[in-house]
Amino acid sequence: MSTRKVSYFYDNEVGNHYYGPNHPMKPHRMRMTHDLVLNYGIYKKMQIFRPRKASELELTNFHSDDYINFLKLVTPDNMHDYSKQLVKFNVREDCPVFDGMYNFCQISSGGSIGCAVKVNSKESDVAINWAGGLHHAKKSEASGFCYTNDIVLSILELLKHHERVLYIDIDIHHGDGVEEAFYTTDRVMTVSFHKYGDYFPGTGDVKDIGADKGKYYSLNFPLKDGIDDESYQSIFRPIIRSVMDFYRPGAVVIQCGADSLTGDRLGCFNLTLRGHAQCIEFLKSFNVPLVVLGGGGYTIKNVARCWTYETSILVDSELKDELPYNDYLEYYGPEYRLHITPNNMENQNTKDYLEKLKIQLLENLRNLNHAPAAAHHDIPPDSFNYSDDEDDEDPDVRISEADRDKKVHHQGELSDSDEEDGRRNYSNGLEATSTSRRNQVSISAYDKERPSYNSRNNNNNNNNNNNNNNNNNNNSNNNNSHHHNEDADVDMDSG
């Protein structure tokens, strides 16, 4: 039986959001995942929390004020009034305006911040938010289906209590937004295993190693089509083992994008659920506090399979391959099994290619200072303490939550067809981006005391009755909060 304390964040509103017809990103996959988690009985081994929605001030700990204000105001009905801002903030095409877009961002980011709060307070050893992992969003720009970067916000929360945080990305796409945010600091190390070449976002070369104090603290392993379980683990394990030894993080954040699985609508890797989940299992062996987030994944039946299986790994629960009855059983036919089989695609990642890159990256790690220390600073207040507002429901009754979810389906939502419009454009036709200082975050500024999450999150409470909030005494404080100046020079000092 698992001795790890595991927290799991889920909001039943998240699956109601819809990017639009033929768009590959389908938030409905989170509802499917949660339904499998419930019906496999995994939920009994976790504490389940509905996340607090991130406030405007919380989001602007990384994002610019004008960008967040725009996301808050724009809707499909009034978007014609924001034509200049749509271009400025890249909210178009792959990042469309959709109903409830800002609410979706609040849920995703609030869950990932909540994960960090649980880890910081030592109430959890592992915290999960499958609605998070939106790693492409920039400080003032949407990108790659991502509007707010919940990962950066979660890491900033972790940095309140941990000198060093390690970020690992196993999505098929490079974790560019997170890398850019922390490119010049040694307090966050980013490690990304991704498809590289004529493929979105076009960044993540092995030569991209960080800058200034962050030099050698960005590590990229560019991969080719068709990598399988064995090849992936032959690089993941030695690289991560060395990173853990050299860097010695106080906490680890892993983005578990499921588009690196075989058969993904936009992907070109050949990993099975077991191969993907072995990354999680390996990280568990280090017994370091772990935040586990979602990410990409566009064959949604496999996304749900993957994240359910990885949830079971985190709570040490064995699952039968035969899927239990669930509300979305028809999605999983005709096999109705948990595990998937690899296809016969060629693995273009030769042993020589992988070995050469592995040696190069291990050599880069030797340039690191062992476990760099941050300057002493006062610890800012934690974000909202979920212990003050835990759900009093009997956990065994939670399975009925699936029946309480709003069943909002949209035309085309059930399809994983490769023939839908946009497959080619979404997978590798988007314009590549480059690392930019304007997308970085000031860690030294964040070390200074900021308003607590408790005081700045209550604007959302009146609209979130499902959260059973008990903290209504702070509502009068929100309007007095001041945003940071996004035009200030970026300072990435360690302390």
UniProtKB/Swiss-Prot annotation:
Biased composition (Low complexity): 454-480
Chief place where the protein resides: nucleus
EC number per UniProt: 3.5.1.98
Enzyme class: hydrolase
Coiled-coil stretches noted in the UniProt entry, renumbered to this chain: none
Keywords: Chromatin regulator, Cytoplasm, Hydrolase, Metal-binding, Nucleus, Repressor, Transcription, Transcription regulation
Basic and acidic residues biased stretches: 396-413
Residues at the active site: 136 (proton acceptor)
Comp. bias intervals (Polar residues): 425-443
Chain spans, region Disordered: 372-495
GO cellular component, one term: cytoplasm
Binding site for substrate: 94, 144, 298
Family: Belongs to the histone deacetylase family. HD type 1 subfamily.
Protein purpose: Responsible for the deacetylation of lysine residues on the N-terminal part of the core histones (H2A, H2B, H3 and H4). Histone deacetylation plays an important role in transcriptional regulation, cell cycle progression and developmental events. Histone deacetylases act via the formation of large multiprotein complexes.
PANTHER family assigned to the protein according to its UniProt record, in alphabetical order: HISTONE DEACETYLASE HDAC1, HISTONE DEACETYLASE HDAC1-RELATED
Entry protein name: Type-1 histone deacetylase 1
Organism: Dictyostelium discoideum
